[in-house]
């Protein structure tokens, strides 16, 4: 775990191996992780979000409307014992083509999934099957077993009709367990909605923890430990801030490389 009361312990990340250092992207691993905006740091503090500010899954269409800017950031445990968080990250200077480039770049298995490790040094391990990362409570195996698309969410219209600023969505119903403990599963439904702004892009990431997707609905699987929900929100906030921090420079750096630095053997399971 590399978070200490919302502070990313960058000085504790493991060094790169001599093989890792052969990657043209190795220098980006050394770039210190930038903290989220002060308002987001406040939102992932110990105080839980008021239930009245939760985006219920039955109202998920709000995420795809212009009014989504009014959604409140934060985390909480819902009355039924499941968890919730929503994190908004502005990504100034990030273009749509850079956002579309990113998923294939992080999935490259070369140099021991170094690209994925660059994203969150010391927390991200590999992007295979399963994905291995530390969500804040130890190295976990993450499985995304049900991709989610706008067509599955019961929206009243196409996302681009609901909001012309809409760029794309990546969502899934998944589960994770601490390595070596497959009996301790945490279920999560995660939806990341990306839109254009005047200065770049904005991503809003909503998490429903303790549930799984089934027949168009969220079905409760287990209660959620408040500490875990808060740590998940913290991890989420740092992930997207780190992406906003690195992406423009990474994309420009790779421009002179064959295939813009992407591994042609990597195929995306979900396309933005």
Regions inferred by a protein language model and the residue ranges of each:
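Sequence termini and other peripheral, non-core segments
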Residues: 1-32, 255-272
């Amino acid at each position: 775990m590399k978070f200490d009361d919302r502070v990313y312990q960058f000085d504790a990340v493991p060094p790169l191996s001599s093989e890792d250092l052969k990657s043209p992207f190795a220098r980006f691993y050394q770039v210190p992780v930038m903290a989220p905006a002060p308002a987001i740091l406040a939102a992932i503090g110990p105080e839980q979000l008021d239930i009245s500010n939760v985006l219920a899954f039955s109202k998920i269409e709000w995420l795809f409307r212009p009014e989504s800017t009014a959604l409140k950031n934060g985390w909480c445990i819902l009355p039924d014992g499941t968890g919730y968080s929503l994190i908004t990250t502005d990504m100034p200077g990030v273009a749509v083509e850079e956002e579309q480039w990113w998923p294939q770049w992080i999935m490259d298995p070369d140099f021991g999934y170094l690209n994925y490790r660059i994203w969150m040094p010391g927390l991200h391990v590999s992007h295979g099957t399963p994905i291995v990362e530390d969500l804040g409570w130890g190295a976990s195996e993450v499985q995304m077993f049900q991709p989610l698309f706008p067509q599955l969410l019961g929206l009243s219209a196409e996302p681009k009709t609901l909001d012309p600023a809409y760029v794309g969505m990546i969502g899934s119903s998944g589960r994770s367990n601490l390595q070596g403990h497959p009996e301790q599963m945490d279920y999560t439904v995660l939806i990341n909605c990306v839109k254009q702004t005047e200065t770049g892009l904005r991503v809003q990431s909503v998490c429903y923890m303790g549930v799984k997707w089934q027949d168009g609905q969220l079905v409760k699987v287990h209660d959620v430990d408040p500490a875990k929900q808060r740590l998940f929100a913290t991890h989420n906030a740092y992930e997207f801030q780190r992406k906003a921090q690195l992406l423009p420079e990474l994309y420009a750096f790779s421009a002179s490389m064959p295939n813009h630095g992407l591994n042609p053997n990597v195929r995306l399971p979900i396309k933005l």
